[in-house]
């Protein structure tokens, strides 16, 4: 997504070698618009990508400092802690026991999704004592997944697989969770 100063940016298609891009405006204007109309735009976007990578389109030079995250904001951010060893270590670091059920029933929380950082922007923190921690994670973007969808059927709902940097303020987490209402400031 090209950071054009708007809240949702402008969808672009980047070449596989990360050297060139074209705007997708003739098909859709934003990544969210692409998700909302996936069945009708997926093939069109794929065709543009094929032509771009074959050198058949007039393109612009890609500069990673000019892009935003694919979704500058989104409707939902649900983070599942599927790496149980990591959950165990993080809980141990803050003096919390890990329930046995986490081995079979993964921990999940709903995080903020109203303002994601661009990939090349600095992460500014007013006070380092808050304990900034960054985790490389895998993000799965889906279409609509109705309640009761089977695991097998859920696979067909996957639209994108992305890498994401999840930022936590580890030293704020214990006091925040002690309030019994979950993450707000620390994630």
Segments the model singles out, each with a brief description of its role:
Residues 1-107, 112-113, 129:
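N-terminal non-catalytic cap/leader segment that marks the start of a structured domain
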């Amino acid at each position: 997504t090209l950071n054009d100063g708007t809240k949702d940016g402008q969808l672009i298609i980047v070449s596989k070698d990360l050297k060139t891009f074209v705007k997708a405006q003739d098909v859709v204007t934003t990544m969210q618009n692409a998700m909302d109309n996936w069945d009708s735009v997926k093939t069109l976007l794929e065709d543009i990508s094929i032509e771009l990578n074959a050198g058949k389109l007039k393109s612009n030079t890609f500069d990673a400092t000019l892009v935003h995250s694919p979704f500058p904001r989104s409707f939902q951010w649900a983070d599942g802690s599927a790496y149980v060893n990591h959950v165990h270590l993080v809980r141990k670091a803050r003096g919390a026991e890990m329930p046995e059920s986490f081995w079979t029933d993964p921990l999940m929380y709903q995080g903020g999704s109203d303002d994601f950082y661009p990939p090349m922007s600095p992460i500014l923190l007013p006070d380092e004592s808050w304990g900034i921690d960054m985790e490389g994670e895998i993000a799965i973007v889906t279409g609509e997944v109705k309640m009761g969808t089977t695991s097998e059927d859920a696979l067909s709902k996957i639209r994108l697989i992305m890498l994401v940097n999840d930022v936590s303020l580890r030293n704020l987490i214990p006091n925040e969770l002690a309030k019994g209402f979950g993450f707000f400031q620390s994630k």
